[in-house]
Curated annotation (Swiss-Prot):
F-type ATPases have 2 components, CF(1) - the catalytic core - and CF(0) - the membrane proton channel. CF(1) has five subunits: alpha(3), beta(3), gamma(1), delta(1), epsilon(1). CF(0) has three main subunits: a(1), b(2) and c(9-12). The alpha and beta chains form an alternating ring which encloses part of the gamma chain. CF(1) is attached to CF(0) by a central stalk formed by the gamma and epsilon chains, while a peripheral stalk is formed by the delta and b chains. One of its GO terms (cellular component) is proton-transporting ATP synthase complex. It comes from Helicobacter pylori (strain HPAG1). This is ATP synthase subunit beta. It is a peripheral membrane protein.
Length: 466
């Protein structure tokens, strides 16, 4: 099953076979030499050109390829290692370890293109996924097997939230996580690895990187590599897995680059005509089955802050919750810098999370919204000009703002304060009490960077004694 190269167009390679036609998505291998160095390259068949000619996408740089070089058809798709041996390791798109450790000899591999779970296999019951992060659990709760969009600019704490979620899933749910770096900066991928090592969560996570400097084929398919590893834990081990994709926009962007090279006519804003279908193909595989679930957190870059751009717009259709990080909140020193009024969740309704949770969440949002509306008056006239009722609202809102902050386990190394996991029960008790006015007598500084309301009371007591 050998063929030869007839044309190289950047990351796209045309191959002709004599008596064999490889299937779409089949892997092809090329072994060649560049400046005396042996190299191997994997291609994936993307289109049939007629006759026994195929157009394939390269999963690595194509420098050094020449016409008439021998290409071998694998007879199967790209397969990547799965199972517990992938934890704590970094992989590239074709499943090779790239962390300079002992190369992995996998005992089990799965193809990266797989069918989404059928209707019979899917689980339809909606269950809340407790993260242990107060602001998320209270105001924009995640659902098991749901998809969450994490929106935020540079330096507001997306990575820290991702690491904390990985930590909490590992320690409280005894679960595993998979991180797919799609079109990531190499530096960020490197930082994440070492931060996870320091944070002690590396042995519970598998990392797959297709970085910014790699060809579009690698950046696009890396999402499937990570997803396949997560699917194994869901289907074979019956676990609830967390799947992180950073950044889902780059998945769409690399698809657009590939589409142009394959000669397809572009659609709106130069994107591929198959954008919605490609996004659906990936997102539909992220689902809850009767065995286990994959809950995904996807960082979404919004080009030029335009939410109507086809790429982010195609992601929105699939999301169950959005966690929006706000720089203004980060500047106040409140971490995690989640915007309590901008973040949304599909399961924030009395039928899904219960009457009590819903009432407390909407009550908190009303107080914060009222405080936001009063800011102009306070700026012009000062606090003293407000009515007694409004003064009370401002006091409570400031306490709520401070109480939405929380020390993280993975940030212990930097902050020096031990991390806190707050159960939903404790979160509701604390915020419910603030709304009822139970803690009106406690100074607002006692609410800053603590876990449960019990700690607030202890902190207030210590402040009083000192």
């Amino acid at each position: 099953m050998e063929g030869k190269i007839i044309q190289v167009l950047g990351p796209v390679v045309d191959v002709e076979f004599e008596s064999y036609l490889p299937a779409i998505f089949e892997a092809l291998d090329i072994n060649f030499e560049v400046n005396g160095v042996q190299k191997s390259l994997v291609l994936e068949v993307a289109a049939h050109l007629g006759g026994n000619r195929v157009r394939a996408i390269a999963m690595d740089m194509t420098e050094g390829l020449v016409r008439n070089q021998i290409v071998k058809a694998r007879g199967k798709m790209i397969e990547v290692p799965v199972g517990e041996e992938v934890l704590g390791r970094i992989f590239n798109v074709v499943g090779e370890s790239i962390d300079n450790l002992e190369p992995l000899k996998p005992s089990l591999t799965w193809p990266i293109h797989r069918k989404a779970p059928s209707f019979e296999q899917q689980s339809t019951k909606t269950e809340m996924f407790e993260t242990g992060i107060k602001v998320i659990d209270l105001l924009a709760p995640y659902s098991k097997g749901g998809k969450v969009g994490l929106f935020g600019g540079a330096g507001v704490g997306k990575t820290v939230i991702i690491m904390e979620l990985i930590h909490n899933v590992a320690y409280k749910h005894n679960g595993y996580s998979v991180f797919a770096g799609v079109g990531e900066r190499t530096r960020e991928g490197n930082d994440l690895y070492f931060e996870m090592k320091e944070g002690g969560v590396l042995d519970k996570v598998a990392l797959c990187y297709g970085q910014m400097n790699e060809p579009p084929g690698a950046r696009n398919r890396i999402a499937f590599t990570g997803l396949t590893m997560a699917e194994y834990f869901r289907d074979e081990k019956g676990l609830d897995v967390l799947m992180f994709i950073d950044n889902i926009f780059r998945y769409a962007q690399s698809g657009a680059e590939m589409s142009a090279l394959l000669g397809r006519i572009p659609s709106a804003v130069g994107y591929q005509p198959t954008l919605a279908g490609e996004m659906g193909k990936l997102q539909e595989r992220i689902a809850s089955t009767k065995n286990g679930s994959i809950t995904s957190v996807q960082a979404v870059y919004v080009p030029a802050d335009d939410l109507t751009d086809p790429a982010p717009a195609s992601v929105f259709a699939h999301l169950d919750a959005t966690t929006v990080l706000n720089r203004k909140i980060a500047e106040k020193g409140i971490y995690p810098a989640v915007d309590p009024l901008d973040s949304t969740s599909r399961i924030l309704s009395p039928q899904m999370i219960g009457e009590k949770h819903y009432e407390i969440a909407t009550g908190i949002q009303q107080v914060l919204q009222k405080y936001k509306d009063l800011q102009d008056i306070i700026a012009i006239l000062g606090l003293d000009e407000l009515s007694e009722e409004d003064k009370k609202i401002v006091e409570r809102a400031r306490k709520i703002e401070k109480f939405l902050s929380q020390p993280f386990f993975v940030a212990e190394v930097f902050t020096g304060s031990p991390g806190k996991y707050v159960t939903l029960q404790e979160t509701l008790e604390g915020f419910g009490g603030i709304l009822e006015g139970k803690y009106d007598h406690i100074p607002e500084n006692a609410f800053y960077m603590v876990g449960s309301i019990q700690e607030v009371l202890e902190k207030a007591k210590n402040m009083k004694n000192s």
